[in-house]
Amino acid sequence: MVNEVGEMDSVSPDDHNNSGISVFEIDSPDYKLNFLSWILDITQEEADKGFEFLKRNNKSIEVLWDLLENLKVFTVVVEDHYVDRVYRDSYYFYYSGKHFSYTRFCKRLSIFDGKLEKNFFDYCSEELQQKFVGTIVIRPIPERSIGRTLLSPKYFLPIDKNGYVRLAKYVVTVFGKQLEVWAFPYGMQDGETTSCAEVTILNLLDYYSQSYPEYHYLLPSEISHLVEKSSFERRMPTTGLSYELISKVFCEAGFYPRLYSAKKMPKNKFRHILSYYIESGIPVAIGLKIAEENKHSIICIGHMQPEKIQLGQILNCANNSESDNVVWVSDTADLVDTYCFMDDNKRPYNISECVEVAKLNTSILSLDGFEVEYMMVPLYKRMILEAADAYDICMSVIASPKFGIKSFSQEWDSETKKITWKY
């Protein structure tokens, strides 16, 4: 491949065999590109068009290249005949009926930080655990090949700023070695059995079913059958789902979801509600408007640490209607504008700002330049109060002359009063 990464050489597992398994040590951009081209079955004709052409026209190359950019030297253990439950389900209810032939098997990449100095089987699980980054499933589907991916965020989040994300514990077995990874699941849509909407459902249910015994996982065929009950046309190949249908699927999965529209409330309130749920440890689905007829769905799983120096610069009024008491409150939701997302068009743990911008004599919430339209929150059935109601109750209590801040503020010294509240 002619470009800044040099020419493409052939890569095969036979060249890197480690006691019967395929082990690759990636220590240069050249070799990383060669490996990705081999694992994704890039033809020589495509490779000859250059690195930039591949990044523009193959989403899997683009995402994997960006994802592995932070790992300067790493080792990949490849399992050739891996059975992935999501792809195998899609294969039997859709791909097996197509005219073209698709294999039933995937490849799974197990990634380790640095080089493995010894034979893979000479390591014990505890030694491998210290280097374990996670796993990536490669489906036998052109262009959108990345399947279920479980990666530790510590290798991919910014090292110069703290972040807070929701993760679940996954146990994986790599050629008999049992390893653990704390991750939020990621995967790409295949464009036929799954769109971004179905991927949002799959990854959220994967996280919740892994974290809490009350929930169970749904496969693509099960999601399709649930949606068919509320649809008036065929579901395969998929054309995507509305956020009303996404919410309906979560109802069927045992959740009591709450659906918010950014157009039906002040943008500042919508942004506050997003912050409240994320700060409460509840991953949510976000609906974006890419173009007039083009929508996209992603998952918000956390936020970056806000700058505390901004505390107190934005104040919100809490008033009590009975006594006319007024208290000015600094809401930490005003400090958070940088969130962590799982977007199947980008690498896992993508960091983006959610800000309010002016557009055509109005204002919209913008995320990476796209308008935020919806937020779907998969709530537990016992969570009676949703965020907006809980906020109103808290603000009324704060301003209450009987139970609020003023009821016990007389016990504070003057310095505490100065930095904590003011009339």
Feature locations, PLM:
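Noncatalytic regulatory segments and standalone regulatory/sensor domains
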Residues: V2-K169, Q305-Y423
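Cysteine-nucleophile protease catalytic domains, especially the papain-like/related folds used
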Residues: N3-G6, S10-E52, L179-A262, E415, ...
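Generic detector of well-ordered alpha-helical segments enriched in charged/polar residues
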Residues: W65, Y92, P220-S224, S247, ...
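Short, well-ordered loop/turn elements at secondary-structure boundaries
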Residues: F132, S145, I159-D160, A168-K169, ...
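Active-site-adjacent bridging/hinge elements
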Residues: Y164-V181
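Residue-level detector of functional hotspots within protein domains
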Residues: V172, W182, D190, F270-H272
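Generic hydrophobic secondary-structure signal
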Residues: V174, Y186, I201-L204, I278, ...
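Active-site-adjacent substructure of cysteine-protease-like catalytic cores
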Residues: S247-V327, T332, T338-Y339
